[in-house]
């Protein structure tokens, strides 16, 4: 596994785009796949396991639009907590505390569209995380 990481790092360092081909990233709560990205936007498919929950977090430089494709989502946005089901959506403004949770037994699948001047995975401040990940500048959604 370390050898794969070394090869990916070398491709990235040399400016090759091939390192971007592996676009699915596993997380404790499920996984995300980057479907498309360009200047000022990134589109992800996010799948959250039953009982899975992303951290309570905010981003300084991007907003997010979420569209539920399958399952039931519990969304925390600022002081509001509400549920969404398939074909419903919500908007998370820049610097708004938020969390995504799977509120059902089936996998939660959604499409996330990020917009902003910086879309790196290190633009995250964590406030609460049931998996014990770091509070700030960690690499995950």
Identify the residue ranges that each predicted region occupies:
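A short hydrophobic beta-strand segment most commonly corresponding to one strand
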Residues: 1-6, 105-126
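A short, N-terminal "cap"/entry segment at the start of jelly-roll beta-barrel domains
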Residues: 1-45, 49-55, 124-141
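A structural signal for the main folded, soluble domain(s) of proteins
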Residues: 35-36, 72, 91, 99
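Structural motif
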Residues: 53, 65, 72-74, 97, ...
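Histidine-centered active-site/metal-ligand motif
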Residues: 57-60, 98
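Glycine- and acidic-residue-biased ligand/ion/polar-headgroup-sensing regions
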Residues: 59-79
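Short acidic-glycine-tyrosine-enriched beta hairpin
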Residues: 78-97
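Asparagine-centered strand-capping/turn motif at beta-strand->loop junctions
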Residues: 100-104
């Amino acid at each position: 596994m370390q050898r794969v990481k070394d090869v990916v790092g070398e491709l990235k360092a040399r400016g090759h785009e091939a390192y971007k081909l592996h676009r699915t990233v596993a997380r404790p709560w499920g996984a995300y796949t980057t479907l498309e990205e360009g200047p000022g936007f990134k589109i992800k498919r996010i799948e959250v396991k039953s009982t899975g929950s992303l951290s309570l977090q905010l981003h300084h430089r991007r907003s997010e639009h979420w569209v539920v494709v399958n399952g039931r989502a519990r969304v925390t946005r600022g002081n509001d907590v509400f549920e969404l089901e398939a074909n419903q959506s919500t908007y998370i403004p820049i610097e708004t505390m938020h969390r995504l949770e799977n509120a059902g037994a089936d996998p939660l699948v959604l499409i996330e569209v990020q917009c902003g001047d910086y879309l790196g995975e290190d633009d995250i401040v964590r406030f609460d995380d049931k998996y014990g990940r770091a509070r700030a500048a960690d690499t995950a959604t």
